[in-house]
Amino acid sequence: VGHGKVKIKPDIDYKDVRDVVFVDGSRVAVDTIIYATGYKISFPFFDDTVINPENNEVSLYHLTVHPDYKGLYFVGLCQPLGAVMPIAERQSIWIADLIEEKAGLPPESEMKQEIQKRRESIYNRYDNSPRHTIQVDFFPFMKDLQREIDRGKSRV
């Protein structure tokens, strides 16, 4: 995508004899269609009042901490441009620090403000679709997590 060899297209409206026609009216002649749907984020074991990923959006501080429910954490709920396992490891280290009270969280209002800031950044960077709601750039996200781990230690 970054090199321009792959073009991002909107949803398919229909396929005629040789072309795929997209919802924006553009057309592409195709030989093969690869149907990759991604996934829908859902937590059927939680009440919707706890977490409701409408449009695949999750309101989690650094995609890890639920600001309204102390002790509710998520690991690996991100779509990195890079590897997920090191991110999950760093999230786990942070969560362990929080559980062991070696680190603290910022005020709820600050966490919610950061969640909204991240959401706006995603909307500005990508098309407004459920596809990119948990997208992260590996290195900046890892730095942000480490920065939060370090800040959290000063809050206890």
Predicted feature residues:
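Flavin (primarily FAD) cofactor-binding/catalytic cores of flavoenzymes
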Residues: V1-M111, Y123-V156
